[in-house]
Amino acid sequence: MYLYIETLKQRLDAINQLRVDRALAAMGPAFQQVYSLLPTLLHYHHPLMPGYLDGNVPKGICLYTPDETQRHYLNELELYRGMSVQDPPKGELPITGVYTMGSTSSVGQSCSSDLDIWVCHQSWLDSEERQLLQRKCSLLESWAASLGVEVSFFLIDENRFRHNESGSLGGEDCGSTQHILLLDEFYRTAVRLAGKRILWNMVPCDEEEHYDDYVMTLYAQGVLTPNEWLDLGGLSSLSAEEYFGASLWQLYKSIDSPYKAVLKTLLLEAYSWEYPNPRLLAKDIKQRLHDGEIVSFGLDPYCMMLERVTEYLTAIEDFTRLDLVRRCFYLKVCEKLSRERACVGWRRAVLSQLVSEWGWDEARLAMLDNRANWKIDQVREAHNELLDAMMQSYRNLIRFARRNNLSVSASPQDIGVLTRKLYAAFEALPGKVTLVNPQISPDLSEPNLTFIYVPPGRANRSGWYLYNRAPNIESIISHQPLEYNRYLNKLVAWAWFNGLLTSRTRLYIKGNGIVDLPKLQEMVADVSHHFPLRLPAPTPKALYSPCEIRHLAIIVNLEYDPTAAFRNQVVHFDFRKLDVFSFGENQNCLVGSVDLLYRNSWNEVRTLHFNGEQSMIEALKTILGKMHQDAAPPDSVEVFCYSQHLRGLIRTRVQQLVSECIELRLSSTRQETGRFKALRVSGQTWGLFFERLNVSVQKLENAIEFYGAISHNKLHGLSVQVETNHVKLPAVVDGFASEGIIQFFFEETQDENGFNIYILDESNRVEVYHHCEGSKEELVRDVSRFYSSSHDRFTYGSSFINFNLPQFYQIVKVDGREQVIPFRTKSIGNMPPANQDHDTPLLQQYFS
């Protein structure tokens, strides 16, 4: 036994050193410096070292001895800066070990890869010590960033996985959605920079079910010494709950980094295919380590992942996705084989061998190596292919869950965050701008763009067509348009937000008298100045909250301009009484069309179009309906006006009206009932009534009707009935009301006799239930199951998706004030049994 253990330790150390050497070989000088010095900076704590802060900061890594590079750094500090290096006290030190995980040291590591560092610490650190260590790690992240290196630290309590603790969504630890799978990835990819060896590697795979007993036997026999090993626990069986949560998390990540996520998503799918006895990849690697089979390029975890996914896709004869996953792997490795290199490193040798086995020709290599120059056609094809592959994975996951009648373990809050991002990215709506380039190609800019308008009555459908070429008849006729929409605003937005339209693009337009080139150029300039292309990704808090308008542009008279009729005419009006909404003797409205372009807090870009005399009223009602009363005001609201005449007056008046209405909608005096705005448009009076849950519009024909409407709103303040006796909603519920989603608010009763429930549907209609008894968790489960039968779906290509899950909140009192917080529970509950007749479309069971 002793000899066997010593042999294993030697193999472990050899593999670890191989990975360290490979990691350093793939790094630039700054990366190497950060990678090499991190253990030293965590072991010591001194004002002359990066990461220093005042306080009793935990320092010291168990079993740490500086290597030559680290000793040289310490000697320089001591020699040239007078630093006296003091070793931490003897005994068990606070930091158990420092490990990289992920692609670092694998064939998937590139010069642009970031570093994910696990700092494993003793469970006896108190809350203050953990906070200080976290602050030090944040300072070290900033120091690394100053050198151009992206590092992310994750503090890991050595007992975390034994107690099934979870972090928060938004970091690499994936909130409550992963546990065993996160440990699986750590065990197969970890590289020890300093500290204790990982105990799990010493336990044979056939003893995994008796992991703790086997470890205690090794300790009792004196074969291993407990304080020399990091023990995060064994890899128990994979629960369906965790599997589903991890799969959602991978889809979440795939939105921003599709090539990177495809391989991991398919690995999870392979696990489900092997259920109920999935061969976790970490166990496979460990088995080969124990057998002495140092294969697959030195047990490279990235190559092993590709090998497992290849086995699975070949077994189910899915060669389309197999080809895709190989291309994703090739692009992730980022070794351009079509270009000669003087030095052939190990990563290039690995990729060359694989490409030869796949039978790829030079043309395919050249196409992939030219990814930096891909334009819209190639990018859109790649985007659709990646999306189809992801959707296929999730259809398979849903079938797997239904077949096994398994449940969903992610908390409602995490599910809400995940599904909101999916909803924002994949929901297809007529006015929504689809972003097709999530890190696929760095530059989609086009030198020429032509916008062509086809009027009604022609062979082609009426509307606007976009081409990425100059308006040469032969080239236009022989090519399909890039995009079509009934309205110009949507096409300009699509071209701008997808990066085709830049300041260097030459614009052409054939507008048939609707829009000319100067007007188009002016609009493009306004949009580009008002809407930045890149913004930080929405936070989990933003995704869990109702979406709010962040940047809003109101585009007036772009496609229809009533003032164009003034040309060569004498128009009589009193300048002192000028009203652009009821202008002149005929009381014409000078706003003929309104286009809305806005970006919301989920980073969706939406467009809407309104035509005719009532376009201003309709646009106002739409804007205000998308603002719940507790929403923050938009960061910016701009009015762009393209009228031939009276442009400044129209723009100013619209700006004033919009600002006044937004102020009324979001006003802190929301408890006052009967707030309204009267507006005269084309000689008719309209009333905008700012009610508790929405904004209604009513045409007021005469004085009696006008005052009657005002009186009604003063009396009731609601356009809907709450129960039969007009029960008043709590103010915090009013403020959180948001159209388009179903919201449940739980409130504890003052006499502790059950709880109250306030339910707002997509149109903010209200139901109230008092003194409810029973389990809130069961209610959440039942509601989720109920909405899984909804038929409201949206489509993306051939895929049906519905991510609009009801949202659950708890009303609490903090310092005497009512607040709304997300409702948290451990489980949504069991899924309904499988329907054997039909496969439910993607995520339909969970997110209907």
UniProtKB/Swiss-Prot annotation:
It catalyses: ATP = 3',5'-cyclic AMP + diphosphate. Residues 541-848 are annotated as: Regulatory. InterPro entries: Adenylate_cyclase_1 (IPR000274), Adenylate_cyclase_1_CS (IPR024686), Adenylate_cyclase_1_N (IPR024685). Pfam families: Adenyl_cycl_N, Adenylate_cycl. Keywords: ATP-binding, cAMP biosynthesis, Cytoplasm, Lyase, Nucleotide-binding, Phosphoprotein. PROSITE patterns: ADENYLATE_CYCLASE_1_1 (PS01092), ADENYLATE_CYCLASE_1_2 (PS01093). One of its GO terms (cellular component) is cytoplasm. GO terms for biological process: cAMP biosynthetic process. Its EC number is 4.6.1.1. The modification Phosphohistidine is found at residue 609. Belongs to the adenylyl cyclase class-1 family. This is Adenylate cyclase. The lineage of its organism: Bacteria, Pseudomonadati, Pseudomonadota, Gammaproteobacteria, Enterobacterales. The gene is cyaA.
